[in-house]
Amino acid sequence: MVTLDGSSLTTADAQRVLFDFEEVQASAESMERVKKSRAAVERIVQEEKTIYGITTGFGKFSDVLIQKEDAADLQLNLILSHACGVGDPFPESVSRAMLLLRANALLKGFSGVRTELIDQLLAYLNHRIHPVIPQQGSLGASGDLAPLSHLALALIGQGEVFYEGARMPTAHALEQTNLQPAVLTSKEGLALINGTQAMTAMGLIAYLEAEKLAYQSERIASLTIEGLQGIIDAFDEDIHAARGYQEQMDVAERIRYYLSDSKLTTVQGELRVQDAYSIRCIPQVHGASWQTLAYVKEKLEIEMNAATDNPLIFEDGAKIISGGNFHGQPIAFAMDFLKVAAAELANISERRIERLVNPQLNDLPPFLSPQPGLQSGAMIMQYAAASLVSENKTLAHPASVDSIPSSANQEDHVSMGTIASRHAYQIIANTRRVLAVEAICALQAVEYRGEEHCASYTKQLYHEMRNIVPSIQEDRVFSYDIEHLSDWLKKESFLPNEHHQKLMTNEGGLTR
């Protein structure tokens, strides 16, 4: 059971809720804060004070006063009119993350909602009812209005949801789970949709996948090093300590561990004096991506525990302030950085693929073909990888440098953070396929060298992946191999259990 309190949710907690489906509850202390904040809203409505979003319209209509008898209609109309999302729905994991993050944000006690609304969010999580939320339509300020409006639609029994593997009207899922739709009152519609939970949820999923992919890239690169009889000296501890980046040192240490008893690696001067940069500089390049991942994780965990509503209620209602915490710029920047970090893993991987298939760069059969000329082997796999890498470069253009004014220029600067998160997710999917191509080529190269000469770790990895992708004995439709291995990479932890603690804790000499 994961307990939410509005301030201590971590990426590890989120992973347990999103992928292990651990149930969620709210802490008693956080619910007390929510009750006090709600009491302030009810006083404001009764006293007919002029407070944005409670007794006024929204955006450019902030100067329009709303009568207290119209308060519920105001919130319902807000949800209906703002549910303007378009395009394919977010993956269910993202929808689930949005429920989690919105509940956690409301539990900070600054938004003025009833505890019943938080109960509804948690009930959807625990019953695995996931709103259908279109991916496109958010400017990333004033928060993720359109996506979160579709989430709110589901909470009030409208719209669609994913439930038990099917897409259906929300009302059908509520009938099957004996849940009742929520009825929104003062401030609650605004509190649900004024926030950054779409970009943060998408960014969280992208980060979790990118972290796994970064580890996988090192293991696949280790197979490539063996397939190319790479020089192990470049991973020596002293050279990386001389530069001082911890992430670079960590990557080098993991590579040394993976290849510790390999008979396929060489030393400088044995076959050549130096390897190409795509081999020799793996710790420097991959380590830089790890640095970026650390930054992204830090910003995500702040935002996952942030109050991003407007206005916010402080001191039990004595202070109510309209501000701009809904602005997604911090996450927009983080996601743009994540795009670059993931794209670079694909860039260097594709160059290693070229070194595996180009007969001018190795002593392997041309394109790793079993019968060069008659059969093309891995020739077009490199094309596919190059295409994905090029697409990544286009997607990596920063979304956060763009802004288009909206709401009659009241909202005259926006973050485009949700676009950045969506593109990060796509780049990571592309990078996974590039790494799958590298793995297929590395497997074939190692097979030519003799897999019995592999290090103990990479030999186990070789056999695990050979269960997914068989040896290339003749040309076949390699698209299937790429997709199957990519799917496996997405699902597998990729760390043999007996090595997990050594590699992932300080006991193994690593800081990560």
Swiss-Prot record:
The keyword Lyase applies. GO terms for cellular component: cytoplasm. Contains an active site 4-methylidene-imidazol-5-one (MIO), which is formed autocatalytically by cyclization and dehydration of residues Ala-Ser-Gly. It holds the Pfam family Lyase_aromatic. It catalyses: L-histidine = trans-urocanate + NH4(+). Its EC number is 4.3.1.3. There is a cross-link at A141-G143 (5-imidazolinone (Ala-Gly)). Disulfide bonds: none annotated. One of its GO terms (biological process) is L-histidine catabolic process to glutamate and formate. Keywords: Cytoplasm, Histidine metabolism, Lyase. It is found in: Cytoplasm. Belongs to the PAL/histidase family. NCBIfam families: hutH, PRK09367.1. HAMAP family: His_ammonia_lyase. This is Histidine ammonia-lyase. It comes from Bacillus velezensis (strain DSM 23117 / BGSC 10A6 / LMG 26770 / FZB42).
